[in-house]
Protein backbone atom coordinates (compact mmCIF):
# COMPACT_ATOMS: atom_id res chain seq x y z
CA UNK A 1 0.00 0.00 0.00
CA UNK A 2 1.32 3.50 -0.86
CA UNK A 3 2.66 5.44 2.14
CA UNK A 4 4.21 8.42 0.38
CA UNK A 5 3.32 10.89 -2.36
CA UNK A 6 6.42 9.75 -4.23
CA UNK A 7 5.19 6.15 -4.50
CA UNK A 8 4.54 5.07 -8.09
CA UNK A 9 2.34 2.11 -8.85
CA UNK A 10 4.10 -0.06 -11.47
CA UNK A 11 2.26 -0.85 -14.70
CA UNK A 12 0.10 -3.95 -14.44
CA UNK A 13 2.26 -6.10 -16.78
CA UNK A 14 5.35 -5.15 -14.77
CA UNK A 15 3.59 -6.06 -11.51
CA UNK A 16 2.61 -9.41 -13.01
CA UNK A 17 6.19 -10.08 -14.12
CA UNK A 18 5.30 -9.98 -17.82
CA UNK A 19 7.06 -6.90 -19.20
CA UNK A 20 10.25 -4.96 -18.46
CA UNK A 21 9.24 -1.58 -19.87
CA UNK A 22 12.73 -0.04 -19.79
CA UNK A 23 14.14 -2.90 -21.83
CA UNK A 24 11.11 -2.93 -24.14
CA UNK A 25 11.50 0.81 -24.82
CA UNK A 26 15.10 0.30 -25.96
CA UNK A 27 14.03 -2.54 -28.24
CA UNK A 28 11.23 -0.49 -29.81
CA UNK A 29 13.45 2.57 -30.31
CA UNK A 30 15.89 0.43 -32.33
CA UNK A 31 13.15 0.15 -35.02
CA UNK A 32 14.38 -3.34 -35.89
CA UNK A 33 12.21 -6.47 -35.90
CA UNK A 34 12.42 -8.39 -32.62
CA UNK A 35 12.98 -12.11 -32.22
CA UNK A 36 10.68 -12.65 -29.24
CA UNK A 37 11.26 -15.89 -27.31
CA UNK A 38 8.98 -17.13 -24.56
CA UNK A 39 8.64 -20.45 -22.71
CA UNK A 40 5.69 -22.37 -21.27
CA UNK A 41 5.78 -25.53 -19.18
CA UNK A 42 5.51 -27.72 -22.28
CA UNK A 43 6.60 -25.68 -25.28
CA UNK A 44 8.79 -22.84 -26.52
CA UNK A 45 7.39 -19.97 -28.59
CA UNK A 46 9.32 -17.74 -31.00
CA UNK A 47 8.04 -14.84 -33.08
CA UNK A 48 9.43 -12.11 -35.29
CA UNK A 49 7.61 -8.96 -34.19
CA UNK A 50 7.62 -5.46 -35.68
CA UNK A 51 6.54 -2.48 -33.53
CA UNK A 52 3.99 -0.21 -35.22
CA UNK A 53 2.00 2.81 -33.97
CA UNK A 54 -1.17 0.72 -33.72
CA UNK A 55 0.63 -2.09 -31.90
CA UNK A 56 3.00 -4.98 -32.48
CA UNK A 57 2.67 -6.96 -35.71
CA UNK A 58 3.81 -10.60 -35.82
CA UNK A 59 5.60 -11.20 -39.11
CA UNK A 60 6.45 -14.86 -38.50
CA UNK A 61 6.15 -17.23 -35.60
CA UNK A 62 5.71 -20.78 -34.35
CA UNK A 63 6.04 -22.94 -31.28
CA UNK A 64 7.83 -26.25 -30.87
CA UNK A 65 4.71 -28.23 -31.77
CA UNK A 66 5.49 -27.41 -35.41
CA UNK A 67 8.54 -29.68 -35.21
CA UNK A 68 6.38 -32.81 -35.47
CA UNK A 69 5.72 -31.72 -39.07
CA UNK A 70 9.38 -32.47 -39.76
CA UNK A 71 9.39 -35.77 -37.89
CA UNK A 72 10.63 -34.59 -34.47
CA UNK A 73 10.00 -37.20 -31.78
CA UNK A 74 12.03 -35.69 -28.95
CA UNK A 75 11.01 -33.40 -26.12
CA UNK A 76 9.34 -30.15 -27.22
CA UNK A 77 10.87 -28.09 -24.43
CA UNK A 78 14.58 -28.94 -24.49
CA UNK A 79 17.64 -27.27 -26.01
CA UNK A 80 17.52 -29.31 -29.21
CA UNK A 81 13.88 -28.39 -29.83
CA UNK A 82 14.63 -24.73 -29.04
CA UNK A 83 17.35 -24.65 -31.70
CA UNK A 84 15.13 -26.31 -34.31
CA UNK A 85 12.35 -23.82 -33.55
CA UNK A 86 14.78 -20.94 -34.08
CA UNK A 87 15.77 -22.48 -37.40
CA UNK A 88 12.13 -22.68 -38.51
CA UNK A 89 11.23 -19.14 -37.43
CA UNK A 90 14.44 -17.75 -38.93
CA UNK A 91 13.57 -19.24 -42.30
CA UNK A 92 9.95 -18.09 -42.03
CA UNK A 93 11.16 -14.55 -41.32
CA UNK A 94 13.45 -14.56 -44.36
CA UNK A 95 10.56 -15.72 -46.52
CA UNK A 96 8.72 -12.57 -45.37
CA UNK A 97 11.67 -10.36 -46.28
CA UNK A 98 13.18 -10.00 -42.80
CA UNK A 99 16.97 -10.35 -42.81
CA UNK A 100 17.92 -8.92 -39.41
CA UNK A 101 16.45 -8.66 -35.93
CA UNK A 102 17.30 -8.10 -32.28
CA UNK A 103 16.70 -10.64 -29.53
CA UNK A 104 13.90 -10.04 -27.03
CA UNK A 105 13.90 -12.56 -24.17
CA UNK A 106 11.56 -10.54 -21.95
CA UNK A 107 12.08 -11.27 -18.27
CA UNK A 108 14.01 -14.50 -18.85
CA UNK A 109 17.36 -14.48 -17.09
CA UNK A 110 20.14 -14.24 -19.73
CA UNK A 111 22.01 -17.37 -18.62
CA UNK A 112 24.68 -18.46 -21.16
CA UNK A 113 23.66 -21.67 -22.91
CA UNK A 114 19.98 -21.30 -21.99
CA UNK A 115 17.21 -22.45 -24.31
CA UNK A 116 16.38 -18.88 -25.35
CA UNK A 117 19.89 -18.66 -26.78
CA UNK A 118 19.44 -22.01 -28.53
CA UNK A 119 16.52 -20.37 -30.37
CA UNK A 120 18.88 -17.51 -31.24
CA UNK A 121 21.47 -19.97 -32.59
CA UNK A 122 18.86 -21.61 -34.80
CA UNK A 123 17.73 -18.26 -36.19
CA UNK A 124 21.35 -17.30 -36.91
CA UNK A 125 21.92 -20.58 -38.77
CA UNK A 126 18.79 -19.86 -40.82
CA UNK A 127 20.54 -16.71 -42.06
CA UNK A 128 19.15 -13.96 -39.83
CA UNK A 129 21.57 -11.29 -38.65
CA UNK A 130 21.12 -10.76 -34.91
CA UNK A 131 23.62 -8.98 -32.62
CA UNK A 132 24.94 -11.37 -29.98
CA UNK A 133 27.96 -12.54 -28.06
CA UNK A 134 29.28 -15.99 -28.94
CA UNK A 135 29.67 -16.82 -25.25
CA UNK A 136 25.89 -16.99 -24.70
CA UNK A 137 25.25 -19.66 -27.35
CA UNK A 138 24.93 -23.33 -26.32
CA UNK A 139 27.64 -25.66 -27.62
CA UNK A 140 26.95 -27.74 -30.72
CA UNK A 141 27.17 -30.87 -28.56
CA UNK A 142 24.44 -29.62 -26.23
CA UNK A 143 22.25 -28.50 -29.11
CA UNK A 144 22.54 -31.97 -30.65
CA UNK A 145 21.49 -33.52 -27.33
CA UNK A 146 24.70 -35.48 -26.80
CA UNK A 147 24.48 -34.99 -23.03
CA UNK A 148 21.02 -36.59 -23.05
CA UNK A 149 22.19 -39.49 -25.23
CA UNK A 150 25.18 -40.19 -22.96
CA UNK A 151 23.07 -40.08 -19.82
CA UNK A 152 20.42 -42.34 -21.39
CA UNK A 153 22.98 -44.93 -22.49
CA UNK A 154 24.51 -45.02 -19.01
CA UNK A 155 21.14 -45.26 -17.27
CA UNK A 156 19.95 -48.01 -19.63
CA UNK A 157 22.96 -50.12 -18.71
CA UNK A 158 22.85 -49.45 -14.97
CA UNK A 159 19.10 -49.35 -14.31
CA UNK A 160 16.81 -50.41 -17.20
CA UNK A 161 13.62 -49.75 -15.21
CA UNK A 162 14.67 -46.21 -14.34
CA UNK A 163 15.66 -45.71 -17.99
CA UNK A 164 12.19 -46.72 -19.19
CA UNK A 165 10.52 -44.46 -16.63
CA UNK A 166 12.76 -41.45 -17.25
CA UNK A 167 12.50 -41.61 -21.04
CA UNK A 168 8.99 -43.02 -21.39
CA UNK A 169 7.84 -40.18 -23.66
CA UNK A 170 10.75 -40.71 -26.03
CA UNK A 171 10.15 -44.45 -26.13
CA UNK A 172 6.40 -44.02 -26.67
CA UNK A 173 7.20 -41.90 -29.73
CA UNK A 174 9.51 -44.57 -31.08
CA UNK A 175 12.78 -42.78 -30.32
CA UNK A 176 15.59 -44.30 -28.28
CA UNK A 177 17.13 -41.32 -26.45
CA UNK A 178 20.63 -42.65 -27.18
CA UNK A 179 19.88 -41.84 -30.84
CA UNK A 180 18.88 -38.24 -30.14
CA UNK A 181 21.92 -36.61 -31.84
CA UNK A 182 21.36 -38.59 -35.05
CA UNK A 183 17.62 -37.91 -34.93
CA UNK A 184 18.31 -34.20 -34.39
CA UNK A 185 20.48 -34.09 -37.51
CA UNK A 186 17.78 -35.83 -39.55
CA UNK A 187 15.18 -33.26 -38.50
CA UNK A 188 17.55 -30.33 -38.99
CA UNK A 189 18.27 -31.45 -42.55
CA UNK A 190 14.54 -31.87 -43.22
CA UNK A 191 13.85 -28.30 -42.03
CA UNK A 192 16.74 -26.84 -44.02
CA UNK A 193 15.75 -28.65 -47.20
CA UNK A 194 12.09 -27.65 -46.85
CA UNK A 195 12.74 -23.94 -46.39
CA UNK A 196 15.76 -23.62 -48.68
CA UNK A 197 13.57 -24.98 -51.50
CA UNK A 198 10.87 -22.42 -50.65
CA UNK A 199 13.38 -19.56 -50.53
CA UNK A 200 14.83 -20.63 -53.88
CA UNK A 201 11.37 -20.43 -55.46
CA UNK A 202 10.81 -16.95 -54.01
CA UNK A 203 14.16 -15.72 -55.38
CA UNK A 204 13.42 -17.26 -58.78
CA UNK A 205 10.18 -15.27 -59.19
UniProtKB/Swiss-Prot annotation:
InterPro entries membership: Rbsml_uL18_euk (IPR005485)
Recorded superkingdom: Archaea
Any single biological process term in GO: translation
Pfam families in alphabetical order: Ribosomal_L5e
GO cellular component: a single term: cytosolic large ribosomal subunit
Keywords assigned: Ribonucleoprotein, Ribosomal protein, RNA-binding, rRNA-binding
Gene3D superfamilies given in the database record: 3.30.420.100
SUPFAM superfamilies documented for this protein: Translational machinery components
Record keyword Transmembrane helix present: no
Membrane-spanning ranges: none
GO molecular function: 5S rRNA binding; structural constituent of ribosome
Family, as annotated: Belongs to the universal ribosomal protein uL18 family.
PANTHER family recorded: LARGE RIBOSOMAL SUBUNIT PROTEIN UL18, RIBOSOMAL PROTEIN L5-RELATED
NCBIfam families, per database record: PRK08569.1
Subunit and interaction comment: Part of the 50S ribosomal subunit. Contacts the 5S and 23S rRNAs.
Function noted in UniProt: This is one of the proteins that bind and probably mediate the attachment of the 5S RNA into the large ribosomal subunit, where it forms part of the central protuberance.
Name used for this protein in its record: Large ribosomal subunit protein uL18
Species name: Pyrobaculum arsenaticum (strain DSM 13514 / JCM 11321 / PZ6)
Amino acid sequence: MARSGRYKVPFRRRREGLTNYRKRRKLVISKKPRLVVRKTNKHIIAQIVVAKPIGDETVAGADTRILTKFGWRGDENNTSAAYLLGLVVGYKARMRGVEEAILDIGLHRPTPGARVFAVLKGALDAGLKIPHGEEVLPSDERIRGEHIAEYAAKLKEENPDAYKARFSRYLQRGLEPERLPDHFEEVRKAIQQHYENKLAKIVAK
